[in-house]
Amino acid sequence: APVSRDAALAVFREYEIDLQRPRALHGCTQPGNAWLELATAPADEVFSDLIVSLQMADRDGAVTESELTRFNNLTYYMSESLNRSLQFDMTIEEALPEAERLSRFCQEFDLLAVIHVGPPPGKGFSGPEVARALDRAGMRFGKDDMFHLYDPRTGKSRFSLANRSEAGTLSYDELESGMLRGLVLFLNVPTVHRPSQTFSDLISVANYVSTELGGVLVDPDKGKLAEAQFDSISKQIRSLESSMKRYGIDPGSEEANRLF
């Protein structure tokens, strides 16, 4: 028999508290046969089939056997409470090596490309000048109190710019009247489409902003970056891009964004 959204979600939420990793509950609507995540589905939806899922790996490592056991217990409780049959996609014995494989993938391809923009010696950057330069470069202030260059097709951030401070965030006060001791542009390589092109665009923005502000592109130790270093990073990104595709996971895909 079909199950209401609230009935399924109530059982799921009662037992999901034992889990640390990201998990989700999806259902197939009746009528309509559309798969929706119950957490965001309309309250009056009714579902014929349910899928409970758990993320098995990410950049922090693989799921443990005890976590998988708790996940199995959650699905058993749901099956019993909702009086529904149950089928696992794989056993714990099959899931553990698959989780390790995904974890190794995350470790192998976890790459953050970072470029620092430093001010002239003994000086800082004027907040209002930074805001104007970034606006002209097409970057917008947004998530996590940082600037982002958004993809107009997807609305997702292609790369970001942070304050060169411990927190990394920027405040409206700093941008309106403050001084900044440096800027950091960064790109989470596996999570964007066409990472090589995106890094090239990041370098273009970094050069533009640096020129506008009278700054210089530097490494984390404040040494001036040479062309050879950009080439080295670009080569590393191209290699990662092709390796990910050989692995069967495209950079910027939904699967890549879940893992990274």
Model-found features: residue ranges?
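Charge-rich interaction surfaces and accessory domains that mediate macromolecular binding and assembly
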Residues: A1-D60, T64-N73, Y77-F109, E212-F260
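Glycine-rich, acidic/polar active-site loops that bind/position phosphate-bearing ligands
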Residues: A62-N72, G124, P128-A131, D135-R136
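Membrane-proximal, solvent-exposed terminal domains/tails of membrane-associated proteins
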Residues: F88-D89, A99-L102, C106-F125, R132-F260
